[in-house]
Curated annotation (Swiss-Prot):
GO function term, MF aspect, one: DNA binding
Subunit structure: Interacts with DNAJC3, probably sequestring it.
Protein's UniProt name: 52 kDa repressor of the inhibitor of the protein kinase
Function: Upstream regulator of interferon-induced serine/threonine protein kinase R (PKR). May block the PKR-inhibitory function of DNAJC3, resulting in restoration of kinase activity and suppression of cell growth.
Signal peptide: none
C-alpha cells in the first residue's frame, strides 16, 4: 500500500514528512530490478503500472549518491537509481512475528544468475558509451547542425512537455475553483506532528497521476511521494493568472460595450481580511443588460486611500476606461457608508458622468437605514439580521414561530397567514421591514423566550443559548425605540422607494415625486418635538405591552453616574440622539443620492414607448438628454430622430403593444434605425438604479451570495471565488500557460527529464 514502504522488514510510513518516499519506476527493466532487489515474491506478478500506482520505497534503501536535494524544497531520485540497501535477516531473530511482506528465498542458481546479469549489463553499458564517444568524435558537424535546428524550432521537446505539465496543473486549479474545493486539506491542528498529509491540490494531482496521465506521471515518477509537488507560492502565482484570464473575458465584453457602471456590495471577510466585492454592469452584444462579478478590492480604513486604490484597480489593473463609466452604487452597512460616500465623491470629481445612484438590488429604506450614522441604529440592524438568520436555521424554528403567530392573530387569521409567509422569506430586505418588525415583535419575544425556557429539552444548548441572547437584545428598550423611530421616519420614503424598484414607468414618475418626499421630511424636521412625542409614546406602549422596563441606555447611565444635575428624560434623550440625527441624515442622503444629474437621467426614461403612451406622447427627452450628448453617434440629428421615434409609436397599429421596459425596446428589430435612441437606452439601462429585467443576467450577485454562504470564512479565497462565481465563462488554458511561462520562468529554467521537479516539503 502507498502508506508503507514496500521493502522487507521496513515499517516506515509515507506520512513521515522527514523521510522521502519514491514510486516504483514504470520502465519495465528498471522496475524489474527494483522488484528483484526487494526480494518480494508477491510483487513479481504485478505489472510496472500497478507497482508504480500502489507501492513505494523509502529513501533508506538507496545509496546517498542516488538521491539529490537540489534545494531545501526539492528531493529527486536519479534516473538510474536502484535500491540496494535492504534488511533481509532481522525477521529471523523473531520467528514468531507475522510479517506483512514475504521475503523470497533465492536458490544458489538464482544468485549466480543475478550476478552474471549484473556483469553483462555493466559491460553492455561500457560498450555503448564507447560507441557514442567514437560517433561524436567522427561527426562533430552533426552536433552543430542539431544545435542550429533547435534555434530554428519554436519549442524544444522539454518546453513542450513543460507546457503540457503546466496545463494539467491549471486544469486542476480551475476544477477546484469551479467546484469550490479549498486548496488546503486538513487543518494544521488535525495533523499529528511529523506526519505528511497532502493538501487538496496535491490529492487531485496524485489522482490524475494514478489515473494514468502520462505528463504528470513522467514528471513525478522519481519524486518523493510525501512531499509537496507544487509549492504554495507556485499555486498562488497560477491562481492569480487563472483569475486574471477569466476576468479578462468579462472585461473584454465590457470594453466592447463601451459604457458600464460599477457596483460594490457589502464588505466581506476573505480569510481574515476585509474585502469589497466589485460588480460591473454593461449591455452585451446581444442587447442584454448583465451584472457580473469581477473581483475583490482589499478594504482600507482610510477613505482617501480606499478611493485611490479603488480607482487604480479599475483603471490600471483591470484596464477599464472610467471616461465610459456612467453610474456607481455602493451597498454597505452603516460602519462603511461614510467611507464609500467619499469614494463616490472622489470619482465624481474626476468623472462627472459617473452618476452616484441607488442600487436596484437594495430597497431604498434599508439603504437609508444602513447609512444612518447612529450607533443604536447599527446595533438594531445587526440584531434584526441575526434574528432572521436564527429562525431560518431550521424548519422547526420557523414552525415554532408560526405557532406563536397563530395564537396572537386568532382574530385576524388573514393577517396572521400573511405574516407567516413573510417570515419564511428574507423579509429584512423589504421596503416595509420595520413595519413588519414592529408588528411581529411580540411574537418574536414570546417565541425566543419559549425556546430558551423549554422544559421538554427539544432544543440543543446552542439553540437555547442563542435564543436567550436574541431575546435579551429585542427586549431592550433602546432597540424598541430605535425600530419605532425608523419605522415612522422611513414611512415617508416607503412608496417612493417601492416605485424605484417597480416598472420603468414607476421609476420615471418616482423621479418627479422626490420634491414632495423632501417637503414632507422637512416638515417633520421643523416640528420634530411633536413628531418625536408621538413616536416615543408608541415605543413606550409597545414596551409596556411586552413588560419591558423603560429606561435610558446603560452606557448613558454609567457615564452620568453620580451626576445629580443630569435631569435628562428618556424622551428628550432619544429625541436628541436618535430622532433628530436620523431625520437630518435621511434628508441629506436623499439630496445626495438623487442629484440633479440623476433626476435628469431618470427623466430620459420617457424614451420607453409605454411611458410615452402614459404621457400622451407629449414628452421632451431632448432637453434631459443633453447630458449624454457626447455619447451619441449623431447628436446633430437627435431632435429629428426623437420626433420619428414618437411618431412611430403614436401611430402604431392597434394590435401592437407598447414596449414597457428598456430591455424590450433594445430588442426591437428596427432599433438600429434609431442609433441615437439606441445609444441613450443603453446608457440608461446600465444605471445601477434600473432593475435587471431578465434574471438570467443577474447571476453575478446571486452566485457571490451563494459562495459566501457556502464557504467557511477561513477557506475563502479571492482567486477561487472568481473562478467559482464565473464558472460558465470560457477559459484559454494555452493563454494561461504562456502567461505563466512569460512571468515566472525563463527558457533556461524549464525542467528537463533528468531533473524532475518536486515542491515544498
Amino acid at each position: 500500500m502507498p502508506n508503507f514502504c514496500a521493502a522487507p522488514n521496513c515499517t516506515r510510513k509515507s506520512t513521515q514528512s522527514d523521510l522521502a518516499f519514491f514510486r516504483f519506476p514504470r520502465d519495465p527493466a528498471r522496475c524489474q530490478k527494483w522488484v528483484e532487489n526487494c526480494r518480494r515474491a508477491d510483487l513479481e506478478d504485478k505489472t510496472p503500472d500497478q507497482l508504480n500506482k500502489h507501492y513505494r520505497l523509502c529513501a533508506k534503501h538507496f545509496e546517498t549518491s542516488m538521491i539529490c536535494r537540489t534545494s531545501p524544497y526539492r528531493t529527486v531520485l536519479r534516473d538510474n537509481a536502484i535500491p540496494t540497501i535492504f534488511d533481509l535477516t532481522s525477521h529471523l531473530n523473531n520467528p514468531h512475528s507475522r510479517h506483512r511482506k514475504r521475503i523470497k528465498e533465492l536458490s544458489e542458481d538464482e544468485i549466480r544468475t543475478l550476478k552474471q546479469k549484473k556483469i553483462d549489463e555493466t559491460s553492455e553499458q561500457e560498450q555503448k558509451h564507447k560507441e557514442t564517444n567514437n560517433s561524436n568524435a567522427q561527426n562533430p558537424s552533426e552536433e552543430e547542425g542539431e544545435g542550429q535546428d533547435e534555434d530554428i524550432l519554436p519549442l524544444t521537446l522539454e518546453e513542450k512537455e513543460n507546457k503540457e505539465y503546466l496545463k494539467s496543473l491549471f486544469e486542476i486549479l480551475i476544477l477546484m475553483g469551479k467546484q469550490n474545493i479549498p486548496l488546503d486539506g486538513h487543518e494544521a491542528d488535525e495533523i499529528p506532528e511529523g506526519l505528511f498529509t497532502p493538501d487538496n491540490f496535491q490529492a487531485l494531482l496524485e489522482c490524475r497521476i494514478n489515473s494514468g496521465e502520462e505528463v504528470l506521471r513522467k514528471r513525478f515518477e522519481t519524486t518523493a511521494v510525501n512531499t509537496l509537488f507544487c509549492s504554495k507560492t507556485q499555486q498562488r502565482q497560477m491562481l492569480e493568472i487563472c483569475e486574471s484570464c477569466i476576468r479578462e473575458e468579462t472585461l473584454r465584453e465590457v470594453r466592447d460595450s463601451h459604457f458600464f457602471s460599477i457596483i460594490t456590495d457589502d464588505v466581506v471577510d476573505i480569510a481574515g481580511e476585509e474585502h469589497l466585492p466589485v460588480l460591473v454592469r454593461f449591455v452585451d452584444e446581444s442587447h442584454n443588460l448583465r451584472e457580473e462579478f469581477i473581483g475583490f478590492l482589499p478594504y482600507e480604513a482610510d477613505a482617501e486611500i480606499l478611493a485611490v486604490k479603488f480607482h487604480t484597480m479599475i483603471t490600471e489593473k483591470w484596464g477599464l476606461n472610467m471616461e465610459y463609466c456612467r453610474g456607481q452604487a455602493y451597498i454597505v452597512s452603516s460602519g462603511f457608508s461614510s467611507k464609500m460616500k467619499v469614494v463616490a465623491s472622489r470619482l465624481l470629481e474626476k468623472y462627472p458622468q459617473a452618476i452616484y445612484t441607488l442600487c436596484s438590488s437594495c430597497a431604498l429604506n434599508m439603504w437609508l437605514a444602513k447609512s444612518v450614522p447612529v450607533m443604536g441604529v447599527s446595533v438594531a440592524l445587526g440584531t434584526i439580521e441575526e434574528v432572521c438568520s436564527f429562525f431560518h436555521r431550521s424548519p422547526q424554528l420557523l414552525l415554532e414561530l408560526d405557532n406563536v403567530i397563530s395564537v396572537l392573530f386568532q382574530n385576524s387569521k388573514e393577517r396572521g397567514k400573511e405574516l407567516k409567509e413573510i417570515c419564511h422569506s428574507q423579509w429584512t430586505g423589504r421596503h416595509d421591514a420595520f413595519e413588519i418588525l414592529v408588528e411581529l415583535l411580540q411574537a418574536l419575544v414570546l417565541c425566543l423566550d419559549g425556546i430558551n425556557s423549554d422544559t421538554n429539552i427539544r432544543w440543543n444548548n446552542y439553540i437555547a443559548g442563542r435564543a436567550f441572547v436574541l431575546c435579551s437584545a429585542v427586549s431592550d428598550f433602546d432597540f424598541i425605540v430605535t425600530i419605532v423611530v425608523l419605522k415612522n421616519v422611513l414611512s415617508f420614503t416607503r412608496a417612493f422607494g417601492k416605485n424605484l424598484q417597480g416598472q420603468t414607468s414607476d421609476v420615471f414618475f418616482a423621479a418627479g415625486s422626490l420634491t414632495a418626499v423632501l417637503h414632507s421630511l422637512n416638515e417633520v424636521m421643523e416640528n420634530i418635538e411633536v413628531y418625536h412625542e408621538f413616536w416615543f409614546e408608541e415605543a413606550t406602549n409597545l414596551a409596556t405591552k411586552l413588560d419591558i422596563q423603560m429606561k435610558l441606555p446603560g452606557k448613558f447611565r454609567r457615564a452620568h453616574q453620580g451626576n445629580l444635575e443630569s435631569q435628562l428624560t428618556s424622551e428628550s434623550y432619544y429625541k436628541e440622539t436618535l430622532s433628530v440625527p436620523t431625520v437630518e441624515h435621511i434628508i441629506q442622503e436623499l439630496k445626495d443620492i438623487f442629484s440633479e444629474q440623476h433626476l435628469k437621467a431618470l427623466k430620459c426614461l420617457s424614451l420607453v414607448p409605454s411611458v410615452m403612451g402614459q404621457l400622451k406622447f407629449n414628452t421632451s427627452e431632448e432637453h434631459h438628454a443633453d447630458m449624454y450628448r457626447s455619447d451619441l453617434p449623431n447628436p446633430d440629428t437627435l431632435s429629428a430622430e426623437l420626433h420619428c421615434w414618437r411618431i412611430k409609436w403614436k401611430h402604431r397599429g392597434k394590435d401592437i403593444e407598447l414596449p414597457s421596459t428598456i430591455y424590450e425596446a433594445l430588442h426591437l428589430p428596427d432599433i438600429k434605425f434609431f442609433p441615437n435612441v439606441y445609444a441613450l437606452l443603453k446608457v440608461l439601462c446600465i444605471l445601477p438604479v434600473m432593475k435587471v429585467e431578465n434574471e438570467r443576467y443577474e447571476n453575478g450577485r446571486k452566485r457571490l451570495k451563494a459562495y459566501l454562504r457556502n464557504t467557511l470564512t477561513d477557506q475563502r479565497s479571492s482567486n477561487l471565488a472568481l473562478l467559482n462565481i464565473n464558472f460558465d465563462i470560457k477559459h484559454d488554458l494555452d493563454l494561461m500557460v504562456d502567461t505563466y511561462i512569460k512571468l515566472y520562468t525563463s527558457k533556461s529554467e524549464l525542467p528537463t527529464d533528468n531533473s524532475e521537479t518536486v515542491e515544498n516539503t
